[in-house]
């Protein structure tokens, strides 16, 4: 089938169905996901001429891909909960703000560095669930805390959760990690600076951002180059 604007829109529709139902109608993920799956099957059958055999094959492939991803997710969550039960996560979260009395730097340490660390070892909402309450405890209002925690770890998603997203990317595209890793690593490395700058802006305003800009550049460089080195050396 020829690829054009219509086929592109049709292929995008199942994703839009899920987003509209979750964001617009406040459906839960399971209901919205089921509706998106039904939409995908109907579109494949009615518009892309996919027969029962092809649809069954794609569903089986999707299940196998999901099991591969779930294996990584369960391992990552086991690692996080083990560290959490040992008190390591709470200890890190409480100790980091003691390094500085500067409000903006405290926001960076918890909302950017600590949240990124949590994304790397756990992910799946853990950075926000852990970092946001710590930020509120430091005196930030709840909106600031959630925004900093959500944005601060955004750059680390691809290689976070023990590289779950990156493994999924390889599985779905069929491309080798050696080909995908360099470009994704440096693009996300640049995003690390942006995430840090936004967290500093939310925490301390423009003055806080300008005052903490050297720290953002130094810490962002350490994280970005470390991620790139690990990615290109296949440590995912």
State where each predicted segment sits:
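Membrane-embedded alpha-helical segments and adjacent helix-loop junctions characteristic
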Residues: 59-138
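Short, amphipathic, aromatic/basic-enriched membrane-interface segments that mark the entry/exit
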Residues: 1-7, 94-102, 117-119, 207-217
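Interfacial loop-to-helix junctions that mark the boundaries of transmembrane helices
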Residues: 1-7, 26-32, 56-67, 178-186, ...
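Hydrophobic alpha-helical transmembrane segments
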Residues: 8-12, 34, 105-109, 182, ...
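Hydrophobic mid-bilayer segments of alpha-helices in multi-pass membrane transport proteins
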Residues: 10-19, 27-49, 70-76, 216
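Hydrophobic transmembrane alpha-helices that form the pore/transport pathway of multi-pass ion
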Residues: 106-193, 204-210
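Transmembrane helix-loop junctions at the membrane interface of multipass transporters and ion channels
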Residues: 201, 221-236
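Alpha-helical transmembrane segments of multipass membrane proteins
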Residues: 14, 18, 36-43, 119, ...
């Amino acid at each position: 089938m020829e690829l054009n604007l219509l086929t592109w829109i049709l292929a995008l529709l199942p994703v839009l169905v899920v987003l509209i139902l979750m964001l617009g109608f406040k459906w839960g993920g399971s209901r919205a996901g089921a509706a998106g799956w039904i939409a995908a099957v109907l579109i494949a059958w009615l518009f892309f001429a996919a027969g029962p055999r092809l649809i069954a094959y794609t569903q089986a492939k999707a299940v196998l891909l999901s099991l591969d991803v779930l294996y990584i997710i369960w391992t990552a969550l086991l690692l996080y909960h083990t560290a959490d039960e040992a008190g390591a996560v709470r200890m890190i979260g409480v100790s980091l703000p003691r390094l500085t009395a500067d409000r903006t730097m405290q926001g960076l340490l918890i909302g950017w560095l600590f949240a990124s660390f949590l994304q790397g070892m756990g992910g799946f909402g853990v950075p926000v669930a852990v970092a946001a309450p710590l930020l509120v405890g430091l005196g930030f209002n709840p909106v600031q805390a959630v925004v900093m925690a959500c944005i601060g770890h955004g750059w680390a998603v691809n290689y976070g959760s023990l590289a779950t997203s990156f493994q999924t990317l390889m599985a779905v595209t069929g491309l080798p990690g050696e080909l995908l890793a360099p470009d994704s690593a440096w693009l996300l490395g640049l995003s690390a600076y942006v995430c840090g700058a936004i967290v500093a802006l939310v925490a301390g305003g423009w003055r806080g951002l300008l005052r903490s800009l050297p720290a953002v550049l130094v810490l962002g460089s350490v994280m970005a180059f470390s991620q790139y080195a690990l990615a290109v050396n296949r440590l995912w």
